[in-house]
Swiss-Prot record:
Top-level taxon of the source organism: Eukaryota
Subcellular location: Mitochondrion inner membrane
Protein name per Swiss-Prot or TrEMBL: Succinate dehydrogenase [ubiquinone] cytochrome b small subunit, mitochondrial
The organelle targeting sequence, given as a residue range: 1-56
Listed GO biological process terms: cellular response to hypoxia; mitochondrial electron transport, succinate to ubiquinone; proton motive force-driven mitochondrial ATP synthesis; regulation of catecholamine secretion; tricarboxylic acid cycle
Organismal lineage: Eukaryota, Metazoa, Chordata, Craniata, Vertebrata
A molecular function (GO) term: ubiquinone binding
Binding site for heme b: H102
Cellular-component GO terms for this entry: mitochondrial inner membrane; mitochondrion; respiratory chain complex II (succinate dehydrogenase)
Amino acid sequence: MAVLLKLGVLCSGQGARALLLRSRVVRPAYVSAFLQDQPTQGRCGTQHIHLSPSHHSGSKAASLHWTSERVVSVLLLGLIPAGYLNPCSVVDYSLAAALTLHSHWGLGQVVTDYVHGDTLPKAARAGLLALSALTFAGLCYFNYHDVGICRAVAMLWKL
């Protein structure tokens, strides 16, 4: 019962305000330093709170890239059964483009996450771009001069 009474005092208008002002988390000095974008003294030294927005937070390019990755993934979910049910050159070339884009973006994230340094990431990205271009060219060549991706997979299943 005593706990409920203390909670009632804390949750009332003056009790909650007094609790917040006495708290180590929120103090008027911290609030004013936050509003002025000044460094404040923290537990482990000086902390600097930035009020300026990130240059990339409002970027439409990141949102568009994320959306296009999801569109290609959903497109692949539809193209794979379409290639099985109706193997034709349109589906073959669509699969070549979608598979190449999907693998390029996925491997690009691996390069971003695991390749560090000044020149090594640039070389890895250039190598990835060359690999993706060769993959697309190879799949298009296979579609044009041979049976195509869909029929090749069907022939492999018959083995």
